[in-house]
């Protein structure tokens, strides 16, 4: 059986992180080795703590380590608009733009038949439940849904599906403008472009 050294194992695990290639993983591993014991211990503690304490917000499905996330808890935000995103990291990009002061809903992905991801694998039913709770008076009344999904095939497929599901519910339904380049990931769009894309959103 081929022996894998502790260093090789660390490089392998680091290279599995998104955006981290083998060379970057190797540099990170050597940095960790050079720092002595204190930093690796703090890093290990932070990783274990985030896995133990962070969970989905029961309302919007953003990550939080409290009962509900800061955006759902903030009484100064508008209940009338919900911005739908694919991933929790997309919220940080939108918040940095300063162009949105409503609520959020995280789908945790996008429809991708090739990867076996359909509507049931996403938080789509929960979004529709929020809308219907508003219509019945058991939840905040929602007037607008803004779809801030990635500008790729999966994002477009998800937008078409959501538009069909939300038809006839008296909502203003819009998607962010094409200031976001085709094929781009929301998480890599700069603040100014994201702000313009939200302000110039297109009604569906």
From Swiss-Prot:
Residues 80-181 form the Toprim domain. The keyword Metal-binding applies. It comes from Bdellovibrio bacteriovorus (strain ATCC 15356 / DSM 50701 / NCIMB 9529 / HD100). Keywords: DNA damage, DNA recombination, DNA repair, Metal-binding, Zinc, Zinc-finger. GO terms for molecular function: DNA binding; zinc ion binding. Belongs to the RecR family. NCBIfam families: recR. May play a role in DNA repair. It seems to be involved in an RecBC-independent recombinational process of DNA repair. It may act with RecF and RecO. This is Recombination protein RecR. GO terms for biological process: DNA recombination; DNA repair. A zinc finger (C4-type) spans 57-72. CDD domains: TOPRIM_recR (cd01025). The keyword Metal-binding applies. The gene is recR. Pfam families: RecR_C, RecR_HhH, RecR_ZnF, Toprim_4. It comes from the Bacteria.
């Amino acid at each position: 059986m081929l022996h894998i050294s502790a260093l090789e194992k660390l490089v392998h695990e680091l290279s599995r992180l998104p955006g981290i290639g083998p060379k970057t993983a190797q540099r990170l591993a050597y940095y960790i080795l050079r720092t002595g014991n204190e930093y690796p211990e703090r890093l290990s503690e932070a990783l274990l703590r985030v896995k133990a304490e962070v969970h989905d917000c029961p309302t919007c499905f953003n990550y939080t380590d409290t009962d509900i996330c800061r955006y759902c808890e903030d009484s100064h935000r508008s209940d009338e608009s919900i911005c739908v995103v694919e991933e929790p990291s997309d919220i940080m990009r939108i918040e940095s733009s300063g162009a949105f002061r409503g609520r959020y809903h995280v789908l945790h992905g996008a429809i991708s038949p090739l990867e076996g991801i359909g509507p049931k694998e996403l938080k789509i039913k929960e979004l529709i439940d929020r809308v219907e709770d508003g219509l019945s008076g058991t939840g905040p009344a929602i007037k607008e849904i803004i779809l801030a999904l990635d500008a790729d095939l999966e994002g477009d497929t998800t937008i078409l599906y959501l538009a069909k599901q939300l038809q006839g519910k008296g909502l203003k339904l819009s998607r962010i403008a094409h200031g976001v380049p085709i094929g781009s990931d929301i998480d890599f769009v700069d603040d100014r472009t994201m702000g313009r894309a939200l302000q110039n959103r297109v009604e569906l």
